[in-house]
Amino acid sequence: MCIRDRNNTSLIEQKVSEKLKSETSNLNIIIKNPFFANTEDILKADGLLIGTTENLASMAGATKDFFDRNYYNVIEKKEGMPVAVWIRAGHDGTGTTIQMKSIIKGLKWRLVQEILICKGPWQKKFIDQCINLSLGFAIGLESNIY
């Protein structure tokens, strides 16, 4: 999972991580701040779960930096890799959704679940929504569905 530290976003990451580690036994769950995730991490991954915030109708700068640094190093090397995405958007998440879909398409990765957009003022239900998306993704990987 690639995620940037922020108070509520960090809370989501913590709860998702705890749930994944307690509910999956055959997966090696690695969580990295996007500034520290690198090409080797992507090449070793069987799937990628991306959590990002939306800032000014665009994906967080940390997430953009992650793709800028790694895009050309992994293009054509991880075609078909399953991906799931959640976006914490104060407004509507449209800009980040468009960007994420474009990048995923360019890398020829597979978006295996609809992008989850947690929009509007912070709500505790965002945690459960992100857990459900993440757990479904992890179970799909663990079961070789993807």
Map each language-model feature to its residues.
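Alpha-helical elements of Rossmann-like donor-binding domains used by nucleotide-donor carbohydrate transfer enzymes
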Residues: 15, 65, 99, 129-136
